[in-house]
Design a protein with these regions (language model features):
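P-loop (Walker A) phosphate-binding loop of NTP-binding proteins
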Residues: 11
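Conserved glycine(s) of the Walker
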Residues: 15
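Conserved substrate/cofactor phosphate-moiety recognition/catalytic segment
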Residues: 18-68
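Short, amphipathic alpha-helical "lid/cap" segments that border enzyme active or binding sites
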Residues: 60, 64, 165-176
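Conserved phosphate-donor/acceptor-positioning beta-strand/loop module used by diverse small-molecule
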Residues: 98-121, 158
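Small-molecule kinase domains that catalyze NTP-dependent phosphoryl transfer to phosphate-bearing small molecules
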Residues: 118, 122-171, 182-185, 190
Length: 190
């Protein structure tokens, strides 16, 4: 079976990392966390600068290429659309995954604005360089910062508002199994 790239995307605060970690535990797929790449690149270049944008996208693409080459069964990549991502990134990712006979599956997480703003201030977001300022989020949102790049239609949309993250991860895992992907089920430890 081809390497499955589960592209878990949504606005800041919808629960991508939490759901991604739980989905990884359930499926056995590796997790490529957006901020692992972003934090590395911001240690070298200012966020949004041309070298930052170029290196971040190169690392994302090279990481996915390496997983496909290594015949990993699956990779969960978390992603937040935002204005410093080039419009070419998603089409380039699709072409590269397809050329290597991988499968790219877009799964969107959503959350209502009130809960999203509550989540943004969570202490756990400080572990990575995640957006935690509600006023900054509102301004960025008003300015359209999260409206690009244009995302393809998701094959599954999960509303995480008021939903336990484990339930969200299980919805995704069950969707993948029903689609014939059949990731392994998490083994319970004794």
């Amino acid at each position: 079976m081809s390497t499955q790239i589960i592209f878990l995307f949504g606005r800041p605060g919808v629960g991508k990392l939490t759901v991604g970690e739980l989905l990884s535990a359930d499926t056995g797929y590796r997790l490529l966390h957006n901020h692992a790449v972003v934090d590395l690149v911001t240690s070298l270049f200012s966020f949004g600068s041309p070298p930052f944008v170029a290196l971040r996208e190169k690392l994302w693409l090279d990481a996915i290429d390496a997983c496909i080459t290594a015949k990993q069964s699956g990779v969960i990549m978390t992603f937040a659309p935002e204005s410093t991502v080039t419009d070419e990134f998603i089409p380039t990712l699709k072409k590269r995954v397809t050329a290597r006979r991988g499968a790219l599956r877009f799964i969107e997480l959503r959350c209502d604005d009130a809960q999203l703003e509550t989540r943004l201030t969570a202490e756990s977001r400080g572990k990575f360089g995640k957006l935690r300022d509600v006023n900054q989020f509102r301004q960025l949102d008003k300015d359209g910062a999260f409206d690009r790049p244009k995302m393809p239609a998701a094959e599954l949309v999960v509303d995480t508002t008021g939903r336990d993250p484990l339930e969200s991860a299980q919805l995704i895992a069950n969707h993948l199994r029903q689609a014939g992907v059949n990731p392994r089920r998490r083994r319970k430890s004794s």
